[in-house]
Amino acid sequence: MSFENAVIGATASSLANIAVYPLDLAKTLVQTQLKDEFVEAGEEAGEERAGSRRQNRIKPIALRSPQAAEQYKGALDALQRIYGAEGVAGLYRGLGSSTVAGFIQSFSYFFWYTLVRKHYFRLKQARGGDARFSTPEELVLGIVAAATSQLFVNPINVVATRQQTRGQAAGAADMRTVAREVHAENGWRGFWAGLKVSLVLTVNPSITYATYERLREALFPTPAAASHLVDSAALLSPGQNFVMGVLSKIVSTVLTQPLIIAKASLQRSGSCFQDFHQVLHHLYSTEGPLSLWKGLGPQITKGVLVQGLLFMFKGELTKMLRKLMFYLALLRSSRRALKG
């Protein structure tokens, strides 16, 4: 059952991410760009800039490549300029590695989440206590599953983010080429850039799924045994799953947006940030506290669409799989009857 849930969850997640990939690309570019006033490239990086009103407060951040300083007014501007310069293909640069990373991460997450949740549920039943999970329990179960999956997928996430943020000047590159660039610049350690903040961000899907379960129990209550032994998404209609997914993702995104920005900034092409504390400090010092939530609009739009589609696809794929298994069982039974 854990393997089936993992395959269904990963497939649903991949389909949802492919559907909104251009928006994901745009929000990554918007989130990782720095203001011109605080960006320099080449040997002048780190020196005070003449005429800058803040030259005594902050030093510019060095970037390894000129395209890393490209500025966009917003997600729509990014999409229009990428399409104008690179065509439709430009809107899907990095799609392959991003889809692979998403599938592996989702598969691992759903596998461990289902497995841990099922065994913990049985343990609670054996002790004779309330079989329902509390919100803290849902969060802990989700964090354990997400942290485990992140260990496997971080290197692919680094490659995917670099492909997204290379820019037209650097040219398109496949996964192998980008992986070689990462290794040449930072060795094997480069593939684990942003791992710490990624582990901290494991609270994001945990908040999402805990919120989903709480909303489902409040708005669409079901018997305790059914809701914990059966995939919750399969108990609701596609529309209900979509609404629950959207609401739960809004909550988790608003709470974790600063960490999402820090992770993307660490993994982007041309970044010289060393850790997520440096990213957050730089953004707060140079652009103010609201910069920690920049790109929140496209992040929420992308996130809620993906989460809504994910729960909808997951619920429908689960129902399809069960129907298929039922028909196969009937077919086997009829064959035995004919042989008998």
Swiss-Prot record:
Any GO BP annotation: ADP transport
InterPro entries: Mitochondrial_sb/sol_carrier, Mt_carrier_dom_sf, Peroxisomal_Ade_carrier
One term of GO molecular function: ADP transmembrane transporter activity
Keyword Repeat among record annotations: yes
The keyword Transmembrane belongs to this UniProt entry's keyword annotation: yes
Transmembrane parts of this sequence: 6-26, 96-116, 139-159, 190-210, 242-262, 293-313
A GO cellular-component term linked to this record: peroxisomal membrane
Membrane topology: Multi-pass membrane protein
Subcellular location: Peroxisome membrane
SUPFAM superfamilies documented for this protein: Mitochondrial carrier
Described purpose of this protein according to its UniProt entry: Adenine nucleotide transporter involved in the uniport of ATP and adenine nucleotide hetero-exchange transport between the cytosol and the peroxisomal lumen. This transport is accompanied by a proton transport from the peroxisomal lumen to the cytosol. Transport of ATP into the peroxisome is required for beta-oxidation of medium-chain fatty acids.
Family to which this protein belongs: Belongs to the mitochondrial carrier (TC 2.A.29) family.
Name the record gives this protein: Peroxisomal adenine nucleotide transporter 1
Gene source species: Eremothecium gossypii (strain ATCC 10895 / CBS 109.51 / FGSC 9923 / NRRL Y-1056)
Gene: ANT1
